[in-house]
Amino acid sequence: MIIRTATGDDWPRIWPFFRDIVAAGETYAYPEDLTAETARPLWMDGHVVVAEEDGVILGSAKMGPNRPGRGAHVSTASFMVDPAAQGKGVGRALGEYAVKWARGAGYHSMQFNAVVETNTGAVALWQALGFRILTTVPEAFESRRHGRVGLHIMYQEL
C-alpha cells in the first residue's frame, strides 16, 4: 500500500465510498443528499491523500489547519476508508501519514473536532497514535443506529 497525494482524477474512485460512508449515518455529519459534484469541494480541498494498492483506492485523508489565522498552528485531518478495505491497516497508515505530515509542515499540534464516540475503532486507533480525548460534546451527533451520541474532541501535541 502506498500513500500518495490525491489528484482530481482520483475523485471518481473516492466518491463511491465517501457516498456510502455518509449514507450510513454513523461517522460523518455531511448532508446525505450530496452529489458527487457538491461533495467534491468538501473533500478535495487542502492536502488530500489516498491509500492505494494495486491501483485500487482503499481510503483517503484530508489535512490542513484546524482554524484560520491565530488558530492555524493547530492542524486537523479527516479520514475515510472504503468499508471493503477496513481491517487492513488503511486507517492506521493514513493516520500515521497525517501526523507525520503535520509535524513536517510545522504544526504545533493536531486536533480532531468530531470523532463519534460510537466509532470505537477510530477512537482506539487515534488513542494508539497518541491522541487523547479532551472532552466529549454530549448528544452532538445523530447516529442512525444509536440515536444521539457524543462527539469527542481529540488532541495530540506534535
Question: Residues of each region from the PLM?
Answer:
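A short beta-loop-alpha structural element at the N-terminal edge
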Residues: 1-14
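Conserved beta-strand-loop-alpha-helix junction that forms the acyl-donor binding cleft
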Residues: 112-122, 140-142
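Conserved GNAT acetyl-CoA-binding A-motif
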Residues: 102-115
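Conserved acetyl-CoA-binding loop-helix of GNAT-fold acetyltransferases
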Residues: 87-102, 123-128
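Acetyl-CoA-dependent GNAT
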Residues: 8, 27-84, 95-97, 101, ...
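Helix-loop element at the rim of GNAT/NAT acetyltransferase active sites that forms part
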Residues: 15-32
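Short hydrophobic/aromatic beta-strand or adjacent loop that forms the aromatic wall/cage
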Residues: 46, 148-153
